[in-house]
Amino acid sequence: MKCANAAALLFFVLCDIGVHGGEIVAELLHSNVTVKWQTDYERQTVDFSIWFGAKTPDLLFLGFSDFGDMNSSDVLMYDNVKREIMDSYTNRDYKIIPDLSQDFQQLRRRKDHFVVRRKLTTCDSRDYAFQRGTTQFYIAASFGYRNLVDIRDKKWILDKKFGKVIEGPTDQPSTDEGVSSLERDVQLVIVNSNSPDPVPNVETTYECIIRKMPFDTVHKTYHIVRMEPYITPGNEHLVHHMEVFLCRDEVEEWSGNCNDPKKPKKSKSCSHVIAAWAMGEGPIHYPREAGLPIGGKGKNEYVMVEIHYNNPELHKGVMDTSGFQFYVTGLLRIYDAGIMELGLIYSDANSVPPNQKAWAMNGYCPSQCTQNLPEEGINIFASQMHAHLTGRKLWTSQYRDGVQIGDVNRDEHYSPHWQHLQQLRPMVRVMPGDTLVTTCVYDTRRRSNVTFGGYGITDEMCVNYIYYYPASEVEVCKSAISNSTLRAYFSQRHGMDGKTMKISDMYNGVKDWSNGVDEEFYNVLNVGNVNMNCLKSNGESFEFKSKDPRQGWENMARPRLFSGSFIRTRDRFQCPAINDMINFE
């Protein structure tokens, strides 16, 4: 494609792809509605084709939202009786109002569908700016009613879906990396429970399944070239995310609660992460030149699948045999691949005060840790970001010599209900000595208590799993605000016992985070020292290399970083969009 005017439109011009398409299907009781789109990056347009099922609605509402709010959203209305479209929006009170600027162009109308076109960004403050990352779609239909002016009206039949109108350079893999062209000797291996087990009727449960790989890993090395979830049909709403670990020791096969005292003691050796998956994601493809190595170490290889069940409605008696499936080949590829975990340490040190609109926290992977990467650097070919219910924006940036040189991955409209692996094309090259910073922005305005960092669904995480080659020894590169920084703050500012109190008790000891207390603490988080996890696959820390013997991974100064000279985001003041209106509430 041509890239004329690319500099002026850098916030959405993507010169390495021509056209991208997608599709969602809304289930609207009387009839399904299918929304297809085709994005043309050269023309900077997106064409939506809306197809009706068995019954055509009288009114159709197609809304676009960053974080799932039906108010202050961009809307396309279709009146099937008049056969007319109307560019509209919803205000704060959920009222549907025609837009002063009609930016949708109707291209075609048939009995069973219609097609419209719009610019990706119109610089209309009532229009949604389509950007890289997640777009949340609201599709509502009215059968028999036409004079509906409030989207909350019970006469609407509503469904919510997720999609990516702009894939960016993180497009899906081409078919030559798919199953159709996998090596001829590929084996499909499913690791799950041998018999159905009931999902516990508690909100958060972690179940572990340990299995021996069913092929000769004693004498031969294999490559895993694709992985994907194996979910029991009907249980998609319960399986929130999974992690897959390779075990260093030979372990007896077992399944049960991960915290069960009967869990084999040698399962502690199952610590090498080889895959991670979260609700809404598809398969993990490896590029044709790389595969994840397994076997060849003179022993049987065991894997452990850890499943996070999220059961907020406390369902009883739901049987589940979910797990993970692997595509394995004995035809080794050029490179061994690895997976690395970036972001924040799972710790109550990384906690968010209540009633915060956009609370950002940074997880550091500093140069002292990336110095352990291969001399030629690594190529990141996929990225998988993960947070829980209050996560709104997630991204990882790359710095060299303290200056930002680009992003690894970014989602400005993150949803925990639709998570996805981003295939990075072109791949991102990270060199020894680079710094990677993973940022998560949280919205806790609906919470009255502190949201702690941790494993539960109501706790928070900030993680980016990066898939890369060639493999290195670095498996975890994460940080947390140092305990000494927190203890000093809570002791000096709030008069707490900084020596004996638990970190969680200190957070809970602050009864009022308003009147500048939150702003003051936010500054502490952004300048205070950090504790680092720079870990090998066996859980051991790398040696901290410094001429100063007093320095180490504990209580270290955070990296000094500076923004690069490029602009990768739309200027919300020069080119407004409805995405920005929340800033004025």
From Swiss-Prot:
<feature type="disulfide bond">
    <location>
        <begin position="208"/>
        <end position="258"/>
    </location>
</feature>
<dbReference type="InterPro" id="IPR005018">
    <property type="entry name" value="DOMON_domain"/>
</dbReference>
<keyword id="KW-0968">Cytoplasmic vesicle</keyword>
<dbReference type="Pfam" id="PF03351">
    <property type="entry name" value="DOMON"/>
</dbReference>
<dbReference type="InterPro" id="IPR024548">
    <property type="entry name" value="Cu2_monoox_C"/>
</dbReference>
<keyword id="KW-0770">Synapse</keyword>
<dbReference type="GO" id="GO:0008021">
    <property type="term" value="C:synaptic vesicle"/>
</dbReference>
<feature type="active site">
    <location>
        <position position="206"/>
    </location>
</feature>
<feature type="domain" description="DOMON">
    <location>
        <begin position="31"/>
        <end position="142"/>
    </location>
</feature>
<dbReference type="Pfam" id="PF01082">
    <property type="entry name" value="Cu2_monooxygen"/>
</dbReference>
<dbReference type="InterPro" id="IPR045266">
    <property type="entry name" value="DOH_DOMON"/>
</dbReference>
<feature type="glycosylation site" description="N-linked (GlcNAc...) asparagine">
    <location>
        <position position="449"/>
    </location>
</feature>
<dbReference type="GO" id="GO:0006589">
    <property type="term" value="P:octopamine biosynthetic process"/>
</dbReference>
<keyword id="KW-0560">Oxidoreductase</keyword>
<comment type="similarity">
    <text>Belongs to the copper type II ascorbate-dependent monooxygenase family.</text>
</comment>
<dbReference type="InterPro" id="IPR000323">
    <property type="entry name" value="Cu2_ascorb_mOase_N"/>
</dbReference>
<keyword id="KW-0530">Neurotransmitter biosynthesis</keyword>
<feature type="glycosylation site" description="N-linked (GlcNAc...) asparagine">
    <location>
        <position position="32"/>
    </location>
</feature>
<feature type="binding site">
    <location>
        <position position="308"/>
    </location>
    <ligand>
        <name>Cu(2+) A</name>
    </ligand>
</feature>
<keyword id="KW-0325">Glycoprotein</keyword>
<dbReference type="GO" id="GO:0005507">
    <property type="term" value="F:copper ion binding"/>
</dbReference>
<feature type="binding site">
    <location>
        <position position="386"/>
    </location>
    <ligand>
        <name>Cu(2+) B</name>
    </ligand>
</feature>
<keyword id="KW-0186">Copper</keyword>
<feature type="disulfide bond">
    <location>
        <begin position="440"/>
        <end position="462"/>
    </location>
</feature>
<dbReference type="GO" id="GO:0042421">
    <property type="term" value="P:norepinephrine biosynthetic process"/>
</dbReference>
<feature type="binding site">
    <location>
        <position position="461"/>
    </location>
    <ligand>
        <name>Cu(2+) B</name>
    </ligand>
</feature>
<feature type="glycosylation site" description="N-linked (GlcNAc...) asparagine">
    <location>
        <position position="483"/>
    </location>
</feature>
<feature type="glycosylation site" description="N-linked (GlcNAc...) asparagine">
    <location>
        <position position="71"/>
    </location>
</feature>
<keyword id="KW-1015">Disulfide bond</keyword>
<feature type="disulfide bond">
    <location>
        <begin position="247"/>
        <end position="270"/>
    </location>
</feature>
<feature type="disulfide bond">
    <location>
        <begin position="369"/>
        <end position="534"/>
    </location>
</feature>
<dbReference type="GO" id="GO:0030667">
    <property type="term" value="C:secretory granule membrane"/>
</dbReference>
<keyword id="KW-0732">Signal</keyword>
<feature type="disulfide bond">
    <location>
        <begin position="365"/>
        <end position="477"/>
    </location>
</feature>
<feature type="binding site">
    <location>
        <position position="241"/>
    </location>
    <ligand>
        <name>Cu(2+) A</name>
    </ligand>
</feature>
<dbReference type="InterPro" id="IPR014784">
    <property type="entry name" value="Cu2_ascorb_mOase-like_C"/>
</dbReference>
<protein>
    <recommendedName>
        <fullName>Tyramine beta-hydroxylase</fullName>
        <ecNumber>1.14.17.-</ecNumber>
    </recommendedName>
</protein>
<keyword id="KW-0479">Metal-binding</keyword>
<feature type="binding site">
    <location>
        <position position="388"/>
    </location>
    <ligand>
        <name>Cu(2+) B</name>
    </ligand>
</feature>
<dbReference type="GO" id="GO:0042420">
    <property type="term" value="P:dopamine catabolic process"/>
</dbReference>
<dbReference type="InterPro" id="IPR036939">
    <property type="entry name" value="Cu2_ascorb_mOase_N_sf"/>
</dbReference>
<dbReference type="InterPro" id="IPR020611">
    <property type="entry name" value="Cu2_ascorb_mOase_CS-1"/>
</dbReference>
